[in-house]
Amino acid sequence: MNFHEYQSKQLLAEYGIPVPAGKVASTPDEAVEVANSLGKGPWMVKAQIHAGGRGKAGGVKFCKTTDDVKAAADKMLGTKMSTYQTAGVELPVNLVLVTTAGEIVKELYLSILVDRGTKTVTYIASSEGGVEIEQVAAETPELIHSLNVDFVEGVQGYHGRDFGFKLGLNAKQAGQFASIMVNLYRLFNDKDLALVEINPLAILDDGNLYALDGKFDSDDNAAFRQKALVAMRDKTQEDETEVTASELDINYVTMDGNIGCMVNGAGLAMATMDVIKLNGGEPANFLDVGGGANKQRVIEAFKLILSSDKVEGIFVNIFGGIVRCDMIAEGIIAAVKEVGVKVPVVVRLEGTNVEEGKQLLRDSGMAIIPADNINDGAKKVVEAVKNAA
C-alpha cells in the first residue's frame, strides 16, 4: 500500500523525525487558512497524489503570499495529474499540503528498505538528494553509501554519525542524522514497512535537517495488524478494477494488452503471461484466482477481466491441484451466461477431475475453445483474437 506525502510526514513526525510544519487542505480558502496558521511565509503548496515527479508536472509551488497560495491550490485541486511515474495514468488531486518553506542549503538522500539480495534491512544514503537515486547510481555511484543492518545489534548512533560524516555533515548535523536513522529503524519495524524513502532530507538555512518529502510502502501481508495504516488507504489513487479485486481477495494487476488471463497460482499466472507474449500476444492482466477458487470466484474473475474494454480474448489456464477442474468448468459456463462474454475464450484444464471438467465444457454448447497445454492455449487465444479482429 502506498501513502500520500502528508501521511508519510505524520508518521515521520510521530517518530521524532523533523518535518516542516504543515497541514492538508481540500479547498483554496482552506489552504489560505492553513498558510495563515503557519505564520509568516513563504510556503509550499504540494498536490497530494500517489506519485513522485509532481514538481515537473506543476504539482509543487513556492508561494510568497497567501494570494499565491490560493491561486496554486485553486489550480491543483479538482484536477487530474500525471507524472513520469504514473505511466500516462492521471490521478485525482483531492488534497494539497501547505507547509512552511525554508531556504534549502543542501539536499541529501536517505532510505531504508528490505534488500532481497542480501536478505537484510538496508540503509541507502547519498549526498546527492532531490534527484532519482537510480540516476545517482548510474552517474556517480561513489556518492552512494549503504549499510546492511545486523538484526541482533540493530542500528546504533555510531552508524548514523559515520554515515553523516561520509555525507559531509558537521558534528551537530551528523548527530541529527544519527537520530533520524535510529528513529527511522523503529518506524520501519513498528509499522511493518517495506520501504521508506526521504528525498530530499535537507539542510535548511537554520542549519538543521528536515525530511522535506517521504515515500512509504507497507507490507500488505502485515495489514491485519496495522489497522491504522490500512485506514490511511486512498482508493481514489488506485486502479478501480484492482480495488474491486482486492475487496474480493483476488490477486489482480491491470496491464496494457488485450488478452485477459484467469489462472490459479501466481507462478503459473506469470508463466502464462510469458507464453502469451512468446506467441505474439499481449496480456491484459495478471489474475490469480487462488487455490481455493469456487464457482462464484470464477464468475467474479470473468467480470473483472471484462471490465476492461481492451480485452479481446480470454485464456483460462487452470491446474487442478486443490481446486477441481469440474468446478472451474461450471464457473466458466455460468460466467459466460451471466456476464455475456462476446470475446473468444480458450480454456486449458489439467489435474483433479479434468475429464469431467472438459466434458462439461463440451456439453455446454458454448463456443469455448479447448487447449491441450499452456503453449497450445496461448497460440489458440492469440489466433482467435487475430481472426476476430
From Swiss-Prot:
Write down the InterPro entries for this protein, in alphabetical order.
Answer: ATP-grasp (IPR011761), ATP-grasp_succ-CoA_synth-type (IPR013650), ATP_grasp_subdomain_1 (IPR013815), Succ-CoA_synthase_bsu_CS (IPR017866), SUCC_ACL_C (IPR005811), Succ_CoA_ligase-like_bsu (IPR005809), Succinyl-CoA_synth-like (IPR016102)
What Gene Ontology cellular component terms go with this record? succinate-CoA ligase complex
Work out whether the entry's keyword set contains Nucleus.
no
Listed A to Z, the keywords are:
ATP-binding, Ligase, Magnesium, Metal-binding, Nucleotide-binding, Tricarboxylic acid cycle
Q: Which sites bind substrate?
A: N264, G321, I322, V323
Give start-end of the signal peptide: none
Q: Which pathway does the database say it acts in? A: Carbohydrate metabolism; tricarboxylic acid cycle; succinate from succinyl-CoA (ligase route): step 1/1
GO MF terms, alphabetically ordered: ATP binding; magnesium ion binding; succinate-CoA ligase (ADP-forming) activity; succinate-CoA ligase (GDP-forming) activity
**What is a biological process (GO) this protein takes part in?**
tricarboxylic acid cycle
ATP-grasp domain ranges (all copies): 9-244
Going by the entry's taxonomy, the superkingdom of the source organism is recorded as: Bacteria
Q: Which reaction does it catalyse?
A: succinate + ATP + CoA = succinyl-CoA + ADP + phosphate; GTP + succinate + CoA = succinyl-CoA + GDP + phosphate
Give the Enzyme Commission number.
Answer: 6.2.1.5
Cofactor section:
Mg(2+)
Q: Which residues bind Mg(2+)?
A: N199, D213
- Cofactor: record remark: Binds 1 Mg(2+) ion per subunit.
Q: Where does ATP bind?
A: K46, G53, R54, G55, G102, E107
What family does the entry list?
Answer: Belongs to the succinate/malate CoA ligase beta subunit family.
Biological role stated in the UniProt entry? Succinyl-CoA synthetase functions in the citric acid cycle (TCA), coupling the hydrolysis of succinyl-CoA to the synthesis of either ATP or GTP and thus represents the only step of substrate-level phosphorylation in the TCA. The beta subunit provides nucleotide specificity of the enzyme and binds the substrate succinate, while the binding sites for coenzyme A and phosphate are found in the alpha subunit.
| Quaternary structure, from the entry | Heterotetramer of two alpha and two beta subunits.
The protein's name in its UniProt record: Succinate--CoA ligase [ADP-forming] subunit beta
Per the UniProt record, the source organism is Xanthomonas campestris pv. campestris (strain B100)
